[in-house]
Amino acid sequence: MSQEIRQNEKISYRIEGPFFIIHLMNPDNLNALEGEDYIYLGELLELADRNRDVYFTIIQSSGRFFSSGADFKGIAKAQGDDTNKYPSETSKWVSNFVARNVYVTDAFIKHSKVLICCLNGPAIGLSAALVALCDIVYSINDKVYLLYPFANLGLITEGGTTVSLPLKFGTNTTYECLMFNKPFKYDIMCENGFISKNFNMPSSNAEAFNAKVLEELREKVKGLYLPSCLGMKKLLKSNHIDAFNKANSVEVNESLKYWVDGEPLKRFRQLGSKQRKHRL
């Protein structure tokens, strides 16, 4: 299968030895992602999966946010789609929401390489959900947090968070944060072993943070039999893979009802016009 892939102006990738490095590079827009950007992330994971020389997939970002989640422009674009293009609202949102979310979440769930996230700042929404699907997370400092503003946006859990958040943070903490739109702050992440290492670097120094993580990883893999790493990931993942696959299907089908009813669109419009407090 071809190892070539289309380009994306917001996301780059490169391969260095056993590392497949994905870089979010739209800091001026807080690395917000449109639907096609999330699909591109999934395509990159598939590309890394097919490369036999790759053992670790590293996701880095830039600026002060890892990713602020879905770009309002993408939501507006879907809202403005010609109604004649779709026979029903259900058909419209199956195309604009369900297919995309199932695809990118599945790409993260089934990824065979060790997934490493370099958390240079906050992550929001679906982007934060994908962070929670990573195997190892390093933080730039103690200012990082994850926020899942589903209740504030008229939505429900997505991106496997029905399973990943209780698994990694505990059931009651997950309820508290999701029900009341509270962030999973650094202390919560540390208490639950979610952050493997805090690099204690300034938030303005994302590029130096990314370079430092990569430098340490190069040292850590020296002398390892890397196929063993993939074998262990496969076994560890087998504990929860069925639950994640089920959650991915149930989440999008339940969420579809909310999109069809129109509440998320109304709330995104309010955010765009500043009528509702911004989720960031």
From Swiss-Prot:
One GO location term (cellular component): peroxisomal matrix
Record's subcellular location: Peroxisome
Active site: E158 (proton donor/acceptor)
Chain positions of motif Microbody targeting signal: 278-280
Keyword field: Fatty acid metabolism, Isomerase, Lipid metabolism, Peroxisome
InterPro entries: ClpP/crotonase-like_dom_sf (IPR029045), ECH/Chromodomain_protein (IPR051053), Enoyl-CoA_hydra/iso (IPR001753)
Pathway: Lipid metabolism; fatty acid beta-oxidation
Main location: other
Binding site for substrate: S68, G69, A70, D71, F72, L126
Keyword Iron found: no
Gene Ontology biological process terms from the UniProt entry: fatty acid beta-oxidation
Annotated catalysed reactions: a (3Z)-enoyl-CoA = a 4-saturated (2E)-enoyl-CoA; a (3E)-enoyl-CoA = a 4-saturated (2E)-enoyl-CoA
CDD domains per UniProt: crotonase-like
Enzyme class: isomerase
Gene Ontology MF terms in the entry: delta(3)-delta(2)-enoyl-CoA isomerase activity
Family matches, as Pfam families: ECH_1 (PF00378)
Role according to the record: Essential for the beta oxidation of unsaturated fatty acids.
Assembly: Homohexamer, dimer of trimers. Interacts with DCI1.
Family to which this protein belongs: Belongs to the enoyl-CoA hydratase/isomerase family.
PANTHER family: ENOYL-COA DELTA ISOMERASE 2 (PTHR43684:SF1), PTHR43684
Protein's recorded name: 3,2-trans-enoyl-CoA isomerase
Source species of the chain: Saccharomyces cerevisiae (strain ATCC 204508 / S288c) (Baker's yeast)
